[in-house]
Amino acid sequence: MFRLVAAIAALSFAMPAQADWHVAESDHFVVYADDSEKDVRRFSEMLERYHAAMEFVTGREAETPSPSNRVTVYAVGGKRQIRELAGSKNVGGFYIPRAGGSMAFVPDVRPSTGELEWSMTILLHEYAHHFLISSSRYAMPRWMDEGSAEFFASARFPRDGEVHIGRPAYHRSAELAFAPEVPLEDLFERGRHRAGEELRRDNFYGRSWALYHYLTFDPARKGQLLAYAREIAAGASSIDAARAAFGDLGQLRKDLDRYLMQRKIKGFVLQPEILPIGEISVRRLSEGMSEMLPVMIRSKRGVDREAAAALLVDARAVAAAYPRDAGVLAALAEAEYDAGNLDAAIAAADAAIAIDPARKNAYVQKGYALFAQAADAEDETAAYEEAMK
């Protein structure tokens, strides 16, 4: 418990108080960053082009999410801040999937036209999971989930607007070269990693990427990946589906090994005209919200009651300095709710709504607090009816 509170306290000093935060909103993403409007916009465009590229390559068209279900990306300022936020020295970025809107935390939003930073690869990998799961009716075996995510996450974004998909997964090269090899039978049968289970130090991720890439591009295997997915959808086990779709697994292993020895491999080079994206709006946050955002980021990361109480001190200080900023007051309402102060959360939300009746987060936090109160009310029915108004 002490380590969590200490990490939050450290982060409050690590993030600059005087900042120039921008928020970019697009069809599928919301991006917060203490960076220039130009870089924030380019980063958002890159993410939207990545989404469009996945739609084009897979032939799937995912429904545009509601504003509250978009993926929110927080650029926290640097690798040190990421490590403090994650509570780990070995984290370059991380992603938190949630039904009500997933979140990603990255060091910065400076777009790259070359090889991506590890934190960006993580974001693209996890968003690939998000896209593929949300656009499919059937769950796929783990190797295919991870192999497809690695396949898309090795993307590249040149300045001319192209998107390159299916490039070599250079971040898996050492794993493929030196880690113990996963037999194909094990690759097909391996299930999800369970909490507390020891991680296997083998080339599962690299091998999954290699097999997915091979089955996507090798002419002799054309249609087999789709046949495998159909076998799975029909109820076959992963290993039985593999034998039905791919034939002799020993021959598949030999063919895959030969494929990986090639000097060059294929990939998709997608032109910007076939990857249309929607409008992206970028705005500078108010001075108050710029000061409140580091508090919000720590809160969004997830806090327990003790850590929430420590965060609340900062939230109240910012709100006292900016009492007429509806965004700040809505964030205060969230901090009060996290700390268990339901009446104070409702009061802060009401104050935000009085200033800006369109402030969505204020209504959300007020609703949370009212429903929490209703659970302990003497007349639960009346309390829930009031909360739903």
Place the predicted regions along the sequence by residue:
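Short coil/linker segments at helix-helix boundaries
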Residues: 368-389
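N-terminal signal peptide c-region/cleavage motif recognized by signal peptidases
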Residues: 14-16
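Conserved positions within tetratricopeptide repeat
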Residues: 222, 226, 253, 309-312, ...
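Bacterial N-terminal signal peptides that target proteins for export
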Residues: 1-6
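Juxtacatalytic substrate-recognition/specificity segment
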Residues: 19-141, 155-159, 190-202, 234-247
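Beta/coil-rich, acidic/histidine-enriched accessory regions frequently appended to metallopeptidases
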Residues: 23, 234-374
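Acidic/His/Gly-enriched intrinsically disordered linker/tail segments
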Residues: 22, 87, 91-106, 136-282
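Inter-repeat boundary and helix-capping residues of tandem alpha-helical solenoids
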Residues: 117, 138, 201, 308, ...
